[in-house]
Structures are given as structure tokens and as C-alpha cells.
């Protein structure tokens, strides 16, 4: 891979990003490397000065390591002797130049992208499974949990971000193409658009699953309007669009889709009993829940319109991943696979046995009922989870272990208090990625909004201890829910990813201790 200095200048001019260029000589320069981390510079490299934590010394280090050209929003004396491309927006520039450096790998992939407040990961895993049933060893996945760039075990690794930085995104795409991948299923976060990680990227199919207030705070989206706006950008940049017609703010969502996509390329889905508030749209697919219990979920997918029927994906489906709320995610995945040319003959078996790390994982503890570990980390996902369990287990006592991250998602905290008041019998408030905040203060913030006449609250900073106390306090007919972290193998504490054995590993340790003691 390489990119010439001349090509960089032309691309930046084309996108109206170039403010000025300081070129050291008239000869064109080929950059054979690209980086925003000075430690990853080796040889003639295009280096980006980006991020709130960028320091000029990083540019000096990049220069010492062989960088030839730097891109920044202002000149740096540390860059004297290097070609300097001064741009209006560094994150947009990095996205545009990274795509070019890796030779536009998205053009060699069928890209299916999901956005939504909840369900992105589940829908993505369902889609990957269906596509793998039809085209084994050819499906890439970029999710909150895993990144898959090839068919071999060492080509599957843990993700750092839901949607990676643009340079990493296009590098991973190129690696996937080189490894023979033909399709990519990816999650796209609102932060990805806010920070221009997917700037210039067009998807073959874009999904809008739902929207509720989340990720609103000083370090994220300033307002809900900004959060929604960034979510909608996925639809504006998709060739075909699929929308959950039951989403809040549907009119705005549908309007965004129609700005760049013809109605015949927009597909709507909803549950069997849903009736839209407007009569100028048609629901293309309906899913009818047959049974959702603690063993499996079964539903029927019914194509309603002619264009829906043409995909040949209607039929009866079962899910090993329990929870009636997952039927909506499964419907989205089946439609996505259908738009990629995969019909029900692969979708039915492909989706049936899917299990997702940290999603509805459960185990029985002798004498203490069932324990569920789930990534549910906002009001909407917690409500869906607790409502399902309350119904499936015939109104059990619910003991919930939960915390809220520091430095972000401040709007989640009153949501946790609300959902605990609505559903929990006992709440064990604990630590969950506190970052630079004091976890005790976060716990107090949640606790202050809980109705203590309805919920018994325990404040336990040590997450292991909180899980142990919740399980120990539970009876044989009770349900313990450990929410928020799912399969995360670390706690984010003061800028450090501190190893964490995962919630389920802790649950199993506690269960073993109880059985032995």
C-alpha cells in the first residue's frame, strides 16, 4: 500500500479540506505507511496529528521514526523539514486519506451496517451467522465485542471500540479483503459519525433499529437532537435502508432515509400487532411471536409487500438466544441477509443456534435460582431484559447488580434508577468502568433517584463482592441479573484497562464457593 503526496493534496482539495500545503521540494513523495500513533511510524509515513491528547512531541517522535508528511489543523515547529498538509478538519482528512491509502476496500465488500441505541451487536451476530451458513469463511464482522477479518482463529480478536478510528477501520477492511472476505457486517455508533470515523463510507444496506436517549453528556453528545442527528447519518449514506417502524421519532428517521434513497429501496418491519400512525407507508415485514420463554424464542416472519416477498425469507424461525426483544433483532438480521441474496433456506438454520458473549448468558445456582449476565447498559435495554424475565418467570423476585460508567453516558444514571424502581426487588449498585470519576459518587447519583419504598438498595463498590452478595441473598425461585458489562474482560479505571475476569466467570466462582461451603 502507498499513497503519493500529490494524491493526498488532490483528495483534500476535492473534499474542500485543505487550508494550505508546505512542500519541502518539487519531487513527489510516496508514503508507504500511515499512522496517527508515532510508535507505529516506520519509514516514509503519512502522520496525523489528531485527538485531544495529541502533544507536539509525538510529531517529533514520528519524524525521528521516518515520517515524511504530517497532516494537522495547524502547523507545528516540530514538523519543520516535513511536508505539512494543514486541513480544516483532521478527522475527516484522516478518513478520506485512509480510504485512499488502503485502496478503497469497501468497494470489494458487501457492507451491512447497523445503528440504534440497543440491539446493534445482537443483530450483527445474527447476520454474520446467517451469511456464514450461506458462505462459510467469507464473512467479516466489526462489532462491540469482536473484530473478524478472516476465517482463521487468529483473525478474530477483541474490539477496542464499537466502530474503530477511520484509519484502523479501512486497514481492517483491506485485511479482510486480502483474507478472502466478501461481506462485512458492522456496528456503527453515533460517536463514529460525531468523530468522523466513517466519513465518506457508503453502505450497501443500512439499518436503523431504534432510538432512545443515551450517550448524552459532556464527553459525548451535547443533546438528544445531536445524538439523533448522528444516528441518522447512516441512513443518508446507505444504498438500501431497513427501518424498525416501531422506533421512536419514526417520522424523522424515515425522512432522513428518503433524502438519499428511493422508497422502493427502503424496507420497514414491525411486530404483528403494530399499527403505524400514518397511512402513507407500508410495513414490508411483520414478525409474529409464537413463544418466548427461558428455553427458546419462536416467531414467524411474514412478508407483506411484493418487494418483501421477492427476498424469499418468510417462514418460521427459532432462536437459542432467549428474550422476546431479540425477535426484532433477528428480523432485522434476516432482512439484511436477504438483501445480500441469502434466503430462508440458510437463514433458518443459520440463526437458530446463535449465542453471543455477554448477551443473556445464564446459569443455575443450586439453592439460589437463576443468574443472568447481560450487557444491558441503558434504560431501554434494561427495561426489555427485566420485563422479559419478570414475565417468563411469573413475577419472581429480581435482584439486580448494576453500575454506570464514568466520564460518559451521564444520562443513563437516572434511567437506571427508573428501571430499578419499576422492576427490581433489590438493587446492588456497584462499579462499572468508573474512568476518572469516583464510583461512589456515581452510585450515589443513581441511588438518589430510586424509590426506596419499592426497592431495597445495597451500595457495594467491589463488583465481585456485589455479585456474591446478590447471589447469596437470592432464594431458589429468585432471579439475579448482573447487568452492564456482559463479557467485557476489563474495568476502565483512570485511563487503564484493568483486567476483569468477566461477570459470568465471577458468577461461576461464587456458585462454586456456595456449593463447596
Curated annotation (Swiss-Prot):
It holds the Pfam family Mur_ligase_M. Its EC number is 6.3.2.-. The keyword rRNA processing does not apply. The modification N6-carboxylysine is found at residue 231. ATP binds at residues 116-122. One of its GO terms (biological process) is peptidoglycan biosynthetic process. Carboxylation is probably crucial for Mg(2+) binding and, consequently, for the gamma-phosphate positioning of ATP. One of its GO terms (cellular component) is cytoplasm. It is found in: Cytoplasm. GO terms for molecular function: acid-amino acid ligase activity; ATP binding; magnesium ion binding. Keywords: ATP-binding, Cell cycle, Cell division, Cell shape, Cell wall biogenesis/degradation, Cytoplasm, Ligase, Nucleotide-binding, Peptidoglycan synthesis. Pathway: Cell wall biogenesis; peptidoglycan biosynthesis. It comes from the Bacteria. Its main location: cytoplasm. UDP-N-acetyl-alpha-D-muramoyl-L-alanyl-D-glutamate binds at residues 38, 160, 162-163, 189, 197. Belongs to the MurCDEF family. MurE subfamily. Catalyzes the addition of an amino acid to the nucleotide precursor UDP-N-acetylmuramoyl-L-alanyl-D-glutamate (UMAG) in the biosynthesis of bacterial cell-wall peptidoglycan. This is UDP-N-acetylmuramyl-tripeptide synthetase. It comes from Lacticaseibacillus paracasei (strain ATCC 334 / BCRC 17002 / CCUG 31169 / CIP 107868 / KCTC 3260 / NRRL B-441).
Amino acid at each position: 500500500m502507498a499513497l503519493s503526496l500529490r494524491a493526498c493534496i488532490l483528495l483534500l482539495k476535492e473534499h474542500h479540506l485543505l487550508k494550505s500545503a508546505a512542500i519541502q521540494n518539487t519531487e513527489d513523495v510516496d508514503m508507504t505507511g500511515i499512522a496517527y500513533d508515532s510508535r507505529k511510524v516506520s519509514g516514509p509515513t503519512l502522520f496525523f496529528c489528531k485527538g485531544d491528547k495529541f502533544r507536539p512531541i509525538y510529531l517529533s517522535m514520528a519524524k525521528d521514526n521516518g515520517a515524511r508528511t504530517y497532516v494537522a489543523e495547524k502547523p507545528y515547529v516540530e514538523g519543520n523539514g516535513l511536508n505539512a498538509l494543514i486541513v480544516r478538519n483532521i478527522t475527516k482528512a484522516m478518513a478520506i486519506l485512509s480510504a485512499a491509502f488502503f485502496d478503497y476496500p469497501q468497494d470489494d465488500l458487501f457492507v451491512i451496517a447497523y445503528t440504534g441505541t440497543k440491539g446493534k451487536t445482537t443483530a450483527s451476530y445474527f447476520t454474520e451467522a446467517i451469511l456464514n451458513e450461506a458462505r462459510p469463511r467469507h464473512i467479516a464482522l466489526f462489532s462491540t465485542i469482536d473484530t473478524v477479518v478472516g476465517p482463521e482463529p487468529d483473525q478474530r480478536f477483541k474490539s477496542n471500540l464499537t466502530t474503530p478510528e477511520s484509519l484502523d477501520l479501512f486497514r481492517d477492511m483491506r485485511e479482510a479483503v486480502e483474507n478472502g472476505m466478501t461481506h462485512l457486517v458492522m456496528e456503527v455508533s453515533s460517536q463514529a459519525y460525531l468523530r468522523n470515523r466513517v466519513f465518506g463510507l457508503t453502505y450497501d444496506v443500512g439499518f436503523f433499529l431504534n432510538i432512545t436517549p443515551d450517550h448524552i453528556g459532556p464527553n459525548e453528545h451535547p443533546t438528544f437532537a445531536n445524538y439523533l442527528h448522528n444516528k441518522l447519518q447512516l441512513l443518508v449514506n446507505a444504498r438500501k435502508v431497513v427501518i424498525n417502524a416501531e422506533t421512536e421519532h419514526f417520522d424523522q428517521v424515515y425522512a432522513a432515509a428518503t433524502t438519499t434513497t428511493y422508497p422502493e429501496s427502503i424496507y420497514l418491519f414491525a411486530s404483528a400487532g403494530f399499527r403505524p400512525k400514518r397511512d402513507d407507508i407500508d410495513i414490508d415485514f411483520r414478525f409474529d411471536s409464537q413463544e418466548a420463554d427461558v428455553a427458546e424464542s419462536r416467531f414467524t416472519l411474514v412478508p407483506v409487500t411484493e418487494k418483501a416477498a421477492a427476498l424469499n425469507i418468510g417462514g418460521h424461525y427459532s432462536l437459542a438466544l432467549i428474550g422476546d426483544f431479540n425477535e426484532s433483532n433477528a428480523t432485522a438480521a434476516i432482512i439484511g441477509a436477504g438483501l445480500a441474496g441469502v434466503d430462508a433456506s440458510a437463514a433458518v438454520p443459520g440463526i437458530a443456534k446463535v449465542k453471543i458473549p455477554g448477551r443473556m448468558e445464564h446459569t443455575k445456582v443450586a439453592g439460589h435460582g437463576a443468574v443472568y449476565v447481560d450487557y444491558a447498559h441503558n434504560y431501554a435495554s434494561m427495561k426489555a431484559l427485566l420485563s422479559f424475565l419478570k414475565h417468563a418467570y411469573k413475577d419472581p423476585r429480581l435482584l439486580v447488580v448494576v453500575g454506570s460508567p464514568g466520564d460518559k453516558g451521564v444520562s443513563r444514571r437516572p434511567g437506571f434508577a427508573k428501571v430499578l424502581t419499576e422492576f427490581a426487588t433489590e438493587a446492588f449498585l456497584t462499579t462499572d468502568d468508573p474512568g476518572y470519576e469516583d464510583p461512589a459518587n456515581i452510585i450515589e447519583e443513581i441511588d438518589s433517584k430510586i424509590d426506596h419504598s419499592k426497592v431495597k438498595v445495597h451500595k457495594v463498590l467491589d463488583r465481585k463482592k456485589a455479585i456474591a452478595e446478590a447471589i447469596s441473598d437470592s432464594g431458589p425461585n429468585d432471579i439475579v441479573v448482573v447487568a452492564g458489562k456482559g463479557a467485557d474482560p476489563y474495568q476502565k479505571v483512570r485511563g487503564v484497562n484493568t483486567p476483569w475476569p468477566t461477570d459470568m466467570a465471577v458468577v461461576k466462582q461464587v456458585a462454586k464457593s456456595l456449593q463447596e461451603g
